[in-house]
Each structure stands twice: as structure tokens, then as C-alpha cells.
């Protein structure tokens, strides 16, 4: 049981302070992006390299792409979390305002990694559960940060768009029909597996997570 001295708001504040100031947090994220970036040439040269779990007989013929989550993988929402603490509120209170502000900063190493991916001729698909109404503001946020995003094809695939729900897997299946997915990046197991596999017990989640390297 929790002691009388336990204060949830204090714990939330400590978590936000850690994410914003800890060198270890900064380095861990930047190092992850660096490691994946170093694998780009290997992934491109090996045309059988496939980070998606479903096989495609045409995999060797398909152009390369990556699938990456947005919030807490690319964009740092810790200022929003701090705002919740200051206002003694909780998610989703104020989330719409935060997204429309388009003022999130990038997590360490994210922009450099994405530019490297694009410069190597790899398409980037941003698969996010932000609602479709935030598409314009999310694109604006990306452009402020210098994050590459296509103006020719829709590579920002959002919840509520085309009937998509919380499950990201159908969006990835669509991408995999026309691209060889060489990397998947995210901060949540649901960024990698179907929704039904993300709603299971802790031990089973750990087993599935061992198949992936989560950011």
C-alpha cells in the first residue's frame, strides 16, 4: 500500500524534470538514433532486410521506407506534461491546444536521423495516433524543426484518417504493399504490434518486446 507521504503530482513532476534535464535520458535517445542511423547502408544493401513481420514475395523489388511514431519518439511533449502538473489536470485536458500550438521541440538526435534517412533516398512514414484534425499543425511543427516530410504523397498517417482507429498495424500493412520497411521506431509496444497484442499481460508483452528494439 502507499504511504501517507506519497504524492502523485510530485512523482509526475520528478518524471518531467528527469526527461528534460537528465544527461542519461538525452544520451540514451540520441545513441539509439545514432545506432539505427549506422545501420542504414546495411539495410539498403541487403534487399531481403525487412523490419515488418509480414512477408511479401516482392520484397526485393520494393523501394525502402521507415515507419516511425511521432509523440515521444520524435516530438518532446514534456512541456505539455508540465502544463498538466501546473494546472492540476490530466490528459487529455489541453491536448488539443498543445497540438495546435505546433511548438513541440524534437527529441535528441531525431532531426539529424530523419534527414540522414531522407538523404539516403528512403521514404519516411509517420504513423501516429494523433487525430487527423491535427495534421496541418503537426506538419507545421515538423517544418519549424526541419523534419523532412513529403508534399507529394501522404506520409503522415493519422488516427481518424481513412477510417483508421487506434491500431497502427493496418496502416503499416498498407505501406508494406508498396515499400520495404527497413526500420520501425517507436516508444510503445503498440508502435510495433497489432493492438490485440498490445493489450495482454506484462510477461507476454515482454516476450513480444524481445522481438523488437524499442526507442
Q: For the regions a protein language model found, what residue spans apply to each?
A:
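Sec-exported extracytoplasmic/periplasmic mature domains
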Residues: 41, 45, 80, 115-123, ...
Amino acid at each position: 500500500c502507499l504511504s501517507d507521504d506519497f504524492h502523485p503530482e510530485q512523482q509526475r513532476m520528478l518524471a518531467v524534470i528527469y526527461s528534460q534535464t537528465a544527461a542519461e535520458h538525452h544520451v540514451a535517445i540520441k545513441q539509439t538514433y545514432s545506432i539505427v542511423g549506422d545501420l542504414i547502408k546495411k539495410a539498403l544493401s541487403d534487399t531481403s532486410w525487412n523490419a515488418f513481420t509480414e512477408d511479401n514475395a516482392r520484397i526485393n523489388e520494393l523501394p525502402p521506407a521507415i515507419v516511425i511514431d511521432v509523440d515521444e519518439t520524435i516530438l518532446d511533449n514534456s512541456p505539455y506534461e508540465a502544463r498538466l502538473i501546473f494546472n492540476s489536470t490530466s490528459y487529455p485536458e489541453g491536448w488539443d491546444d498543445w497540438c495546435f500550438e505546433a511548438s513541440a521541440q524534437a527529441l535528441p538526435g531525431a532531426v539529424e536521423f530523419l534527414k540522414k534517412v531522407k538523404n539516403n533516398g528512403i521514404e519516411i512514414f509517420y504513423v501516429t495516433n494523433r487525430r487527423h484534425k491535427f495534421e496541418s499543425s503537426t506538419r507545421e511543427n515538423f517544418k519549424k524543426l526541419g523534419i523532412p516530410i513529403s508534399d507529394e504523397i501522404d506520409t503522415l498517417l493519422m488516427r481518424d484518417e481513412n477510417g483508421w482507429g487506434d491500431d497502427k498495424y493496418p496502416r503499416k500493412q498498407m505501406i508494406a504493399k508498396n515499400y520495404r520497411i527497413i526500420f520501425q521506431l517507436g516508444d510503445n509496444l503498440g508502435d510495433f504490434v497489432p493492438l490485440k497484442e498490445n493489450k495482454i499481460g506484462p510477461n507476454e508483452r515482454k516476450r513480444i518486446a524481445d522481438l523488437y528494439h524499442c526507442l
